[in-house]
């Protein structure tokens, strides 16, 4: 699957390193929560994982292939839902017709189910949607793309409480043993019930890298009398 090895990155030659000798790996069938405050490097790490940014040193490999090479065989296995993005002035149906062929396992059935859960249909035009609605439409497309890696950057931003509930339902219904999902967020309460593994980062450093089952095993609950 996807493996980050000794990665270092900065946004310029004279800029300080945001990541240095950073290593991390994804396993199939796991939903990862990438947690940290704003500015901790979460979005940058997602872009490095998707091949949209290139590391200064080290590698990000998917099945042994460097994602920075941006080979079609690698890119068709990765889909990213950015925190903010622009979409063309077309309908979702037109967007699917143009872009679905890039993803060999694209499923119109999954797309239909996701849109139903979001109370949408593929006739919607992107330019007529709010940012939250655009995110639902694009999230549905990325889930339908059926890639082995799905990266989501602050997916609940712009969602009201019912929309957050819809999103959790959609993600849970479309997770599989072959897929890895990474959800980057600083609002852990929105997604905590979905997570199998937690990666906590700050200033480009790993503060925690552990499965949720290990966290549960280490917790001790002490009963205290009510005052």
What are these regions (language model features)?
Residues 32-37:
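The feature captures the beta-strand-to-loop junction immediately N-terminal to the Walker
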Residues 1-4, 8-21, 28:
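A short, flexible loop at the N-terminus of ABC-type nucleotide-binding domains that lies
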Residues 164-177:
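Helical segment within the ABC ATPase nucleotide-binding domain
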Residues 80-137:
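ABC-family P-loop ATPase nucleotide-binding domains
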Residues 50:
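Helix-to-loop junction immediately C-terminal to a conserved catalytic motif
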Residues 58-69, 73-74:
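Conserved ABC transporter NBD signature motif
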Residues 150-154:
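Catalytic Walker B motif of ABC-type/P-loop ATPase nucleotide-binding domains
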């Amino acid at each position: 699957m996807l493996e980050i090895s000794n990665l270092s990155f900065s946004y310029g030659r004279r800029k300080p390193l945001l990541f240095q000798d950073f290593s991390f790996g994804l396993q199939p069938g796991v939903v990862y929560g990438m947690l940290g405050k704003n500015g901790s490097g979460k979005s940058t790490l997602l872009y490095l994982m998707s091949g949209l940014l290139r590391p200064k040193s080290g590698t990000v490999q998917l099945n042994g292939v460097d994602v920075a090479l941006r080979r079609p065989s690698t890119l068709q296995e990765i889909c990213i839902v950015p925190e903010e993005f622009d979409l063309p002035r077309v309908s979702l149906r037109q967007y699917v017709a143009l872009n679905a062929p890039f993803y060999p396992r694209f499923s119109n059935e999954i797309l239909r189910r996701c849109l139903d859960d979001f109370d949408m249909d593929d006739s919607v035009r992107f330019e007529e949607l709010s940012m939250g609605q655009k995110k639902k439409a694009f999230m549905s497309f990325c889930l339908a793309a059926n890639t082995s890696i799905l990266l989501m950057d602050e997916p609940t931003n712009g969602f009201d409480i019912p929309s957050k509930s819809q999103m959790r339902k959609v993600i849970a219904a479309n997770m599989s043993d072959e897929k890895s999902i990474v959800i980057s967020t600083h609002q852990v309460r929105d997604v905590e019930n979905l997570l199998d593994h937690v990666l906590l980062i700050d200033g480009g450093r790993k503060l925690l890298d552990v499965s949720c089952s290990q966290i549960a095993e280490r917790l001790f609950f002490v009963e205290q009398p009510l005052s």
